[in-house]
Structures are given as structure tokens and as C-alpha cells.
């Protein structure tokens, strides 16, 4: 083959980032190709988009497939380079004047066939240099993939912890305000209980805030360790075959230790103390709600809205589901325009539910009519996937860091005050009060259950 053509052929197999032959090559949607490790390292801290280093176009591809054609060609090019290296005069066996073709895994040396069968090496494990290099490189790539997956998991967890830390003080203040407002509706002799409960809530809030900071720092430190180990493996993977074999050492063992004891995000629970007489006060406004399930487009439409609110990618702290759900939605037979009303719902040990009240137009809309986000939905919901659970309220969407109610949940609707309050009946404690609700009467109770 003409040397010029050979050089062009070789250039096509060179990664533009590391300037070495491709290692596990991937081709992104703009058409340019890179080593997978080089592309990943170029991703840096951007969770969604990265710019192509060749054309600067952005790509959001994450699950990249290996370009098998480039991988085979790059492997062939590396074999040619290895063969040329081993065929050189300097690499001939000094004793037998033969080409070294075998690799001794015990002392990590290159041997000719005669040396590999000598008394010194007879009991050692040998294999052809070419296959040994491929095997070692594949082990490195597998370990790098594990490291990258852990790095991505740690990155997601760090984002969750950063968001929680940033919003935590505001969340604690919202809880304090809601509990103060509830005590204002109670008799004056509750003053000492109110003071005690608020002080305990503040103390718990400060303790959790401190733990969130520590958790975030651990994840940030682990991010640097994971990246450093990944870069070290990448550097080893790109070494010429002979150098890779001789320098391999304990790098796999060290990388395995990095994967141990990965920090996990906290599951903060800011439980509030019981409010004496809370249920007795609310029972003065007790009503019985009759639910009717209807098979209609509006039901399907609303369930999809609820599901998207629960698992929307804009809320990193909320679990994401990949399963296709089956949704059950029931409307209350009653409607409310004024006054105060209280009812309870038995949730038991179930997950993936939401209930509350909504503006009437939700029932009248069909799936082709657009409603902005959660406007007019005043709900308490609970969702769970394989790794976490979340309790939330809507209008606006707000995660509630409290223990999940395990039996009955009460709802108190105050049409004049424009508030919807949720209480844990067993604990006689306030979960949250949605203030300043944008009611557009009549209001109708709803209950939604999503099965995954």
C-alpha cells in the first residue's frame, strides 16, 4: 500500500481528542467519532448537553453505541504497530535471536517461544502478547464503564443534595409558618405546646441542614476521586500494548476500592409534633365524600398531568419512572363554592397516589384542551420508585420532607381563606397548608391512584 494512502487510513482511526488510535470508538449525531472515554471526560459537568470538539454542535446523546467498524479497524492498526515494534532489532530475544511473541503474566515480561518453555518460566502462565494486550484493555474498559456509571449516579445525587441544601431553610420556614397559623385557630392554652413544637422543628431543621452540607461535601469529594481514577484508567488504556502490559500493576484493584462506600443522598424527614385537639376541631366541618369513577378522556388527560407532575425531569428530587402506568381517577360527587369542609382518605401502605380538590374546569376539559401545568389542582401526593419515595403538594409543586402517612390523611378546605390543609390523622399533625389558592368555584374533590 502506498505510504501516503496508509497515512490517510491511519488518520481516520485517530481520536481528535487524545490523538491516539480509537479506544471503544463512538460516533455522535453530528457524525464525528471519538474514544468513548475521551468523549465522556469532555462532557465535564454538563448533565444534558456537550459540544462536539470538532464542529461545536451540541449533542444530548448519552447511551452511545460502540462503532464496531472503527473498533475493528483501530484494533488492526494497533496490531500492525505492535508487530512492527516486536520485529525491530532491539526487541529480538538476546539469547535465541527470535521475535518475542509471548507475555509472562507472573513477571510481566516479553519472551520468545523458547524462553517461555525454559525452566525459569515453565510453570508460569503465558499467552500471546497480542491477545494479552486485548484482554487487559477490555478489562480496563469494563472497569471504566462501571466507574462512569457510578460517577453519573453520584452526579445526580449531588444535584439532588445541592437543590435540597439550597431550598432547605425556605422549606423549614414554610413549615413553621403553616404550624403557627394552625395554632392561631386553637385555644390559647396551647401556647406552651406551640412553643415546644416550633423549637423542636427549628432544631431538627438546623441538624438536617448541617447533615445536608456534609453529604454534599462527601459527594463532591467522591466526584473528584472517581474522575481522577477514570482519567488514570484512560491514560493506561491508551498506552502502547507492550507498555500497557508491563505497567498494568494493581490498577484494577485500586479502581475497585474507589467504587466501595459510595455516598448516598439523605432522606431528610422533618416531622412535626402533634397538635392537641386538631382532629376534634376539624371534625366540626366533617363531610362524607362520595367518589365516582368515570371512564372519560378527561380522566386520562388528568392522570397524565398528575403523572408528569410527579416524575417531571424539571424536578430532580422527584423519582423518575420508566414503567407504563395504569391510572385510576375518581371525582367527588359533591362540589363546593363556599364554607369549610373536612374529610379523610385511607391511604394505608399504598404508594403513587394523589388526592385533594380541583377547580371544576378540570373535569370538563378533554385531553385536547391545554391547561397550564398544575393550575387549579390542590393536591397531596405520594410517589415511589425503586430507589426513593417522595411526598409532595401542588400549587406550587413542593416536596414535603416528612414521614409518609401510614393510615388516614385528612383534608381541610377553607373556601373563604383560600387554603387547603392536609393532616396526618394518626399523628394529629399538620402535613402542610397550601396558601393563597387560586380557587375558581365550584371546587370538586378528586382522587388519583397510579399503578406501575
UniProtKB/Swiss-Prot annotation:
Q: Name one Pfam family in it.
A: zf-B_box
Starting at the broadest rank, the lineage of the source organism is:
Eukaryota, Metazoa, Chordata, Craniata, Vertebrata
Instruction: Write out the entry's keywords from A to Z.
Output: Metal-binding, Zinc, Zinc-finger
* Superkingdom to which the source organism belongs: Eukaryota
Q: Where are the zinc fingers (B box-type)?
A: 88-129
Q: Name one GO cellular component term.
A: cytoplasm
Q: Which SMART domains match?
A: BBOX, RING, SPRY
Q: Where does Zn(2+) bind?
A: 93, 96, 115, 121
Q: Name one GO molecular function term.
A: ubiquitin protein ligase activity
> What Gene Ontology biological process does one annotation of this record name?
innate immune response
Family designation: Belongs to the TRIM/RBCC family.
Record's InterPro entries? B30.2/SPRY, B30.2/SPRY_sf, Butyrophylin_SPRY, ConA-like_dom_sf, SPRY_dom, TRIM/RBCC, Znf_B-box, Znf_RING
Q: Please state what the protein is called.
A: Putative tripartite motif-containing protein 49B
**Zinc finger (RING-type) in chain:** 15-56
Q: Which residues form the B30.2/SPRY domain?
A: 269-452
Amino acid at each position: 500500500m502506498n505510504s501516503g494512502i496508509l497515512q490517510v487510513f491511519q488518520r481516520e482511526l485517530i481520536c481528535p481528542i487524545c490523538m491516539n488510535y480509537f479506544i471503544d470508538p463512538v460516533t455522535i449525531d453530528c457524525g464525528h467519532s471519538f474514544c468513548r472515554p475521551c468523549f465522556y471526560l469532555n462532557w465535564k459537568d454538563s448533565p444534558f448537553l456537550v459540544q462536539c470538539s470538532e464542529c461545536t454542535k451540541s449533542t444530548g446523546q448519552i447511551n452511545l453505541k460502540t462503532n464496531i467498524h472503527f473498533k475493528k479497524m483501530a484494533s488492526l492498526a494497533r496490531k500492525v504497530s505492535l508487530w512492527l515494534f516486536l520485529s525491530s532489532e532491539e526487541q529480538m530475544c538476546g539469547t535465541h535471536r527470535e521475535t518475542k511473541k509471548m507475555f509472562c503474566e507472573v513477571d510481566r515480561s516479553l519472551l520468545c517461544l523458547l524462553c517461555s518453555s525454559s525452566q525459569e518460566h515453565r510453570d508460569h502462565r503465558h499467552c500471546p502478547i497480542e491477545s494479552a494486550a486485548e484482554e487487559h484493555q477490555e478489562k480496563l474498559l469494563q472497569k471504566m464503564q462501571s466507574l462512569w456509571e457510578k460517577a453519573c449516579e453520584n452526579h445526580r445525587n449531588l444535584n439532588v443534595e445541592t437543590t435540597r441544601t439550597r431550598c432547605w431553610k425556605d422549606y423549614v420556614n414554610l413549615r413553621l409558618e403553616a404550624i403557627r397559623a394552625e395554632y392561631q385557630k386553637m385555644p390559647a392554652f396551647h401556647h406552651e405546646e406551640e412553643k415546644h413544637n416550633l423549637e423542636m422543628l427549628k432544631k431538627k431543621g438546623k441538624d438536617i441542614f448541617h447533615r445536608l452540607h456534609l453529604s454534599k461535601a462527601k459527594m463532591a469529594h467522591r466526584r473528584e476521586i472517581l474522575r481522577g481514577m477514570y482519567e488514570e484508567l484512560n491514560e493506561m488504556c491508551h498506552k502502547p500494548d507492550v507498555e500497557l502490559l508491563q505497567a498494568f500493576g494493581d490498577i484494577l484493584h485500586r479502581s475497585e476500592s474507589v467504587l466501595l462506600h459510595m455516598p448516598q443522598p439523605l432522606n431528610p424527614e422533618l416531622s412535626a409534633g402533634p397538635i392537641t385537639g386538631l382532629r376534634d376541631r376539624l371534625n366540626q366541618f366533617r363531610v362524607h365524600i362520595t367518589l365516582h369513577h368515570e371512564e372519560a378522556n378527561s380522566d386520562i388527560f388528568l392522570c397524565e398531568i398528575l403523572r408528569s407532575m410527579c416524575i417531571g425531569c424539571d424536578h430532580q428530587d422527584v423519582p423518575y419512572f420508566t414503567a407504563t402506568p395504569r391510572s385510576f381517577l375518581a371525582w367527588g360527587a359533591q362540589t363546593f363554592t363556599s364554607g369549610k369542609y373536612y374529610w379523610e382518605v385511607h391511604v394505608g401502605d399504598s404508594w403513587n397516589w394523589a388526592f385533594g380538590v380541583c377547580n371544576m374546569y378540570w373535569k370538563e376539559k378533554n385531553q385536547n384542551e391545554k391547561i397550564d401545568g398544575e393550575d387549579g389542582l390542590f393536591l397531596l401526593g405520594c410517589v415511589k420508585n425503586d430507589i426513593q419515595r417522595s411526598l409532595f403538594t401542588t400549587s406550587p409543586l413542593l416536596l414535603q420532607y416528612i414521614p409518609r402517612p401510614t393510615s388516614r390523611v385528612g383534608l381541610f378546605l377553607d373556601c373563604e381563606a383560600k387554603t387547603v390543609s392536609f393532616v396526618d390523622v394518626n399523628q394529629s399533625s399538620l402535613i402542610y397548608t397550601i396558601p393563597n389558592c387560586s380557587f375558581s368555584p365550584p371546587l370538586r374533590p378528586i382522587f388519583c391512584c397510579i399503578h406501575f
